[in-house]
Amino acid sequence: AGVTLVRDAGDRYGINDAIRDEQRGGRVAVRSPGLGIKRPKRYGGFMARDIETGGDVAPVVAAMAATADDIKIILTGIIDFAAGDVKGAPQFDEDELRVMVETAHAHGRKTFAHCSGLAGLEVAVAAGVDSIEHGFFMTPSILDVMAEKQIAWVPTVSPVHFQWARPDLAGWDANTVGNLRRILDGHAEHIGLAHRKGVELVAGSDAGSPGVAHGVALVDEIFHFLDAGVAMAAALESATSRPRRLWGAASADVQVGNRADLLILDASPFDDENALRSVRLLGG
């Protein structure tokens, strides 16, 4: 599929750190947060550690920054597809999240937040996280703040799209399928709006979710951007130079002295977007 930069989003078993370390200097660069951060008895136990009180936040983030490439925060729950809404209130308030962000920045690390729903999105943008992952139930006003503060958005359309496209595998009824379609339509509308407002859109697939295959799902995500009205050049940037620039990866663009981390296709995607699925050569 041509993927040469992977940003993992948390793993309680440390496999992400191990793969990152094994791949150093190899073809694929892996960024790992190690464990994310969450509240006890809330969503995210498979990828995050618990923080009990606000007083624990700064020292925990400082300690994590010693080995983490980025700091992952589980700010909200997941979407209840049957109800058509996010489960529960935000796990952290604005003050707690701001301490995490400021501590991470003080240690040279960026933050990214698992977040959907208006309540969580308001906390995320107010605290100044560097990137919002998922961001379902987005609003135009939140996008305005994201554009102003240069907060990136990784919309991860693919997992929800799979749930809608294959309800037979998930056992969804007609009501839930309708909710999924409504969620996807709203998401696409706001992705297009984000593009027009100048929000830093980044293609990320949430690979490993049901029906979301590593590698090829990133190409699917580019197609979701195109379907939402994102121009081809911007959609390609969202999966190439932009994430490299935002996450601080080496060789973010084509310049003398940079690594030639190039994807060669059989044809130009500007002439035929399906050329994105026909990789001829991976350079670098």
Question: What is each of the regions a protein language model found here?
Answer:
Residues 112-113, 130-139:
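Catalytic beta/alpha-barrel core
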Residues 126-131, 147-153, 171-174, 198-200:
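Glycine-enriched alpha-helix->loop->beta-strand junction motifs that scaffold or abut catalytic
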Residues 14-17, 120-121, 139-143:
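Short, well-ordered alpha-helical microsegments
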Residues 1-105, 151-160, 166:
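Divalent-metal coordination cores built from histidine and acidic residues
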Residues 93-104, 112-125:
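N-terminal active-site wall of soluble small-molecule enzyme domains
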Residues 106, 110, 171, 175, ...:
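His/Asp/Glu-enriched, well-ordered alpha-helical/loop segment
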Residues 2, 30, 71, 104, ...:
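Divalent metal-coordination and catalytic microenvironments
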